[in-house]
Amino acid sequence: MAKICDHCGKKPQSGNNVSHANNKSKRRFEPNLVSVRAQLPSGEVKTVTVCTRCLRSGAVVKPVAKHA
């Protein structure tokens, strides 16, 4: 599974681990992604992988639960 947000396209960035002695080694900063059931603009409900920032901002709409 690619670590990419389906809504905003956020993906991993590269950076450094920096030790106390100021030694540097490469690392990856990965986005905080979650799989949620979301209602698409067409009205279809689908499972999508989105970052938590998109969830909190309301960019992704969760479907209304159907109760029997």
UniProtKB/Swiss-Prot annotation:
The gene is rpmB. Residues 13-22 have a biased composition (Polar residues). One of its GO terms (cellular component) is ribosome. It comes from the Bacteria. Residues 1-30 are annotated as: Disordered. This is Large ribosomal subunit protein bL28. GO terms for biological process: translation. Keywords: Ribonucleoprotein, Ribosomal protein. GO terms for molecular function: structural constituent of ribosome. PANTHER family: 50S RIBOSOMAL PROTEIN L28, LARGE RIBOSOMAL SUBUNIT PROTEIN BL28A. Belongs to the bacterial ribosomal protein bL28 family.
